[in-house]
Amino acid sequence: MSPQTETKASVGFKAGVKDYKLTYYTPEYETKDTDILAAFRVTPQPGVPPEEAGAAVAAESSTGTWTTVWTDGLTSLDRYKGRCYGIEPVPGEDNQYIAYVAYPLDLFEEGSVTNMFTSIVGNVFGFKALRALRLEDLRIPTAYVKTFDGPPHGIQVERDKLNKYGRPLLGCTIKPKLGLSAKNYGRACYECLRGGLDFTKDDENVNSQPFMRWRDRFLFCAEALYKAQAETGEIKGHYLNATAGTCEDMMKRAVFARELGVPIVMHDYLTGGFTANTSLAHYCRDNGLLLHIHRAMHAVIDRQKNHGMHFRVLAKALRMSGGDHIHSGTVVGKLEGEREITLGFVDLLRDDFIEKDRSRGIYFTQDWVSLPGVLPVASGGIHVWHMPALTEIFGDDSVLQFGGGTLGHPWGNAPGAVANRVALEACVQARNEGRDLATEGNEIIREATKWSPELAAACEVWKEIKFEFQAMDTLDTDKDKDKKR
């Protein structure tokens, strides 16, 4: 190269491959308030040191590639690169480590969950040097939080819209989830709402199929909730699923729901995508619609303990993207959810400020500043005998959703709804009187059956139903110490 054509990029350039840890492993780094912090569970391939594995994650999810390139000299890598600033072994696991990575805020587009995830959990999860990789938690700095609008309305505004205070809200997913005509579907909604539920719900895969087109379903469900409102004097809602094959069709359904005057719509945020979800959340905010979020497909991402992404990260992403409700597991029902871990991400959904607490799986202190909270939805295999535990675990700011636990009542849908409402009111009253729901729950339900034949019938049907399986998502403990105990 002649002196006339030599550039700054060529000065000191050495072609070839060098270890990631030489550039991206910086244990002396002091994190900034504006950094996005990530905790990865890293399982390196045999022979790969944990420092190299952690540095590889930082590199491949930020500025790095597999070899030194000329254009590195045209920017400031020290300003833009991700940094692995800490590594610790996972208790009780061989060859697993928690790698802490800090990302400069300038790496991310403002207000875009899509861009954030494309960087942090993009190609790096297919990296050959890693046997497995899981994103356990993120710390979102307040500077980045403030670029998001978050939930369309939030918990307090929803309560004000519905005029419902001092108790969890009650819902029901209409079953069978597929196959009903629009008219029969609307009839089931009406019966449940008339019986005392606050909401009924489309299931996640109810979109616009040949047996029930979306417009017909919207019309019959709107008729059902208005009729139930007139009879009960309470505000009712049905989660009209606006999820569609295109964003244009999704928005068309949301617009039609608004024109019908219903209070709430629904979206499958993982299958629909974060870009679509954020767009729908903006529309709901501008047009007074609440937004219920279903997490269909989440277990594909978060079920395995050593690979994928923990649901607490997906929950944080949803709070930023926008949603007023999200399914969060039940702890006591048929779906996955260990108590302390579930309550950890429930707090991340609802509270303004959450302290680091590894006993609940929370790796970082999170400050949401003024971002509204999200109501957790407990749904899946729950019935009246679970009501005391659900009320005690989730508290008032939650939605308890009984599908089969309403529609499976031997006397029909409306009596099933009555049973759930009576059980909830009994638990709330007992709690307010100072009784312990955890120890006296069954007694409280039995007492309530004396003045509610609907509840008595429900208790008889489901008295033997239990879902007792070991949770997959558990806290890390030292297995050798556990054995000694």
UniProtKB/Swiss-Prot annotation:
Q: What residues make up the catalytic site?
A: K175 (proton acceptor), H294 (proton acceptor)
Tell me the enzyme class.
lyase
Cofactor requirement: Mg(2+)
- Ligand binding (Mg(2+)): K201, D203, E204
PTM-bearing positions, type N-acetylproline: P3
Q: Give the catalysed reaction(s), semicolon-separated.
A: 2 (2R)-3-phosphoglycerate + 2 H(+) = D-ribulose 1,5-bisphosphate + CO2 + H2O; D-ribulose 1,5-bisphosphate + O2 = 2-phosphoglycolate + (2R)-3-phosphoglycerate + 2 H(+)
Residue positions binding substrate = N123, T173, K177, R295, H327, S379
GO biological process terms held by the UniProt record: photorespiration; reductive pentose-phosphate cycle
- SUPFAM superfamilies linked: RuBisCo, C-terminal domain, RuBisCO, large subunit, small (N-terminal) domain
Cellular component per GO? Answer: chloroplast
Q: Which organism is it from?
A: Bartlettina sordida (Purple torch)
Functional summary from the UniProt entry: RuBisCO catalyzes two reactions: the carboxylation of D-ribulose 1,5-bisphosphate, the primary event in carbon dioxide fixation, as well as the oxidative fragmentation of the pentose substrate in the photorespiration process. Both reactions occur simultaneously and in competition at the same active site.
Protein name as it appears in the record? Ribulose bisphosphate carboxylase large chain
